[in-house]
């Protein structure tokens, strides 16, 4: 009887563990991470003249999308690290640059985290924390950009800059 209760308790624990397990699946979206630069010391300066890491978001649709309340993070287990401010939108087929400089007190779109030069991930989530895009990137060799080719839909590769432009325009 004791053995049976022990097995039942173990089974219950396993079922509850499985049922409560959080999954981090990516849900397709019209808004994607299109390009990022984890090492930027001389290439593109932000509005403060600082050469910071950055992430480019691309809108695959032809309609403007309101990004108010979306989140960016460098860790899918902590998807709500930095919230995109209210009133932020991206036009159809347009680009949005967000500086991943660890200084969210600066005016404009500046996150409270930096991208690692050792390689890591960039994660875009909806306000309900549904992951819409997640990009894992290796350590770069020099000041290269990790870009999606073809633009918005393809796989990622290290290449020369296409800041705020189509990655197909080479």
Where do the PLM segments sit?
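Bacterial Sec-dependent N-terminal signal peptides
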Residues: 1-27
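Intrinsically disordered, low-complexity linkers and terminal tails enriched in Ser/Thr/Pro/Gly
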Residues: 17-170
